Amino acid sequence: VELEVLGLIAKYGSIRGLVNLHGLVYELQSRGVLKTDFTFIRYSFGYYSKDLEELLSTLRKLELIRVRRSGDGTEVVEITEKGLRVLEAARGFKEGPMSRV
C-alpha cells in the first residue's frame, strides 16, 4: 500500500493540495487502478481517508515525501530523493535479480 501511494506521487512529480491527493487516490482506488483499501468519507470539500492521512504522515516522518507550501499557500506533496531510492529498490526487488541479466 505504501509503495502504491509513493509510486502515485512519484508519477505526478508533485500534487497540489492534500484534498486533491485524497480525491485522486479515491478515484484510482474506486476504478481498481490502485490496489489499496482505504476507507473514504465524502465531505463537502471532497473525499477524505483517515487511513491515507496516517500513511502520508508516516511517509513524511520517514522522509519519503515532503509537504511544502507554495507561494499561494497551497500544500504541495512531493516525493523526496530518499523516497525515489526506496521506490526504485522495491521495484527492482519485485522484478528479481535475474530480470536485469
Where are the regions a protein language model picked out?
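Domain-edge interaction signal
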Residues: 1-101
